[in-house]
């Protein structure tokens, strides 16, 4: 039996090995990376199974902690039962004892004298905003005090009429009259007048009192009505005394302290009195008595007259019936001096350094001869035709035509490194006749040497040495100028030259400028007082006025002196663009007789 069992086991092993050999080799399953290069799918599954076990343990611990806390709270409540009962019993006993011994409240003493105690005011009702939907802003003008009393006595058919009672009439101008007929009372009917501010807050005793017994007829319309028309009617009032039949008169005089002046100012009188028109219509204010009385029978009737262009037309005719005037009241003319006007304030843009320190010292008007008018107007016309490609920012304050320049600093030196000549400058065009004054004077012996070292105050940057030498050569042959403050002597000796007999002095060369404009020098027209030196052709360009005088035979102007660059740079009129390098010069300080300045 044992042999058979071992044989069977041997056969099984052989069969199994044959079956394994007959199976094809299995291909490996590709691994899926959850995190590429760090975590594959097998590791991810292992982590998930471990996390599930931790969640189960956490739930068990949370349930255990909850049960322990509930048991501990029950023990705490059991221990606090006795102290809580004792505290509640104590509070109940104290409350019962306080009820047995109540204290009386006496209240506040001297409430009337205490400023902190007072009755609350009634809150104001909410007003509708003017910006609400459907609302229109309305300005409510207060009604006059005296007029409101008469509104109640009038008939409902004429709501716009109001009476001028005796309280509004002058006390001194009243004259008693003996009449058996009902007295006529003047009534003023203003067409639409929102408010009569003249009679506002007036007392019966001190209203419209005319001092010195001087009266004048004055129509007093409302301020808010531009062209009111007043109609005066007569109303039978037998209950009123005869003293009410008189003329409403006001005195238009400037007198402080009067009772009427407190209610009617001079500005109100100005608006009330019609202004004279262009045809000469004037309102004749009569300062004497204006009571035009006419006795018909035994009745005294008053006449209120308002002046018109043809004469005073009576508004109130004799009789008891209402009369209307044949001429309308002259309307109030507009005063041009009181019309609103545009308030123009020029704004100055300061583009020149050190201008705020001495703003009035640079641009100072000097008298100019009448013969320069034509050349100056021509130069201005040419200045307006400047080429559009030249971007120049002109300041907002105008340069005067005959302005005298004074150096704005204590020592104006040329610093080309800081302000090199270039286009696009923010400095304005120079006006014709714009001159520069010399501050420092040099002895005459300096004029012989052409070296740039002659200008110790000029700061020449690197690269400008050649130009400095050329300027020195030009400066060597410069013309002498008279000192400041000396005018030409009017005699036969100096009549031709126009200079004084004193030894002249020259300007100090501290302001040489090398300027490269983009224009053709042949097509350039210089304004009077400006000259240019063309380095390429070695030619000095003079203004057109000087050239014309030279052709006619008049003596030419002396060679011009170099300008200063402390404030502005020379500008010329251009027509075409081209690369050239001329130099700009200006006339000397004193006016040359034939230079047109």
From Swiss-Prot:
Residues 1-32, 171-192, 302-335, 549-569 are annotated as: Disordered. Transmembrane segments: none annotated. Residues 1-23 have a biased composition (Basic and acidic residues). The keyword Phosphoprotein applies. The modification Phosphoserine is found at residues 237, 241. Keywords: Phosphoprotein. Residues 557-568 have a biased composition (Polar residues). It comes from the Eukaryota. Residues 175-186 have a biased composition (Low complexity). This is Uncharacterized protein C2orf81 homolog. It comes from Rattus norvegicus.
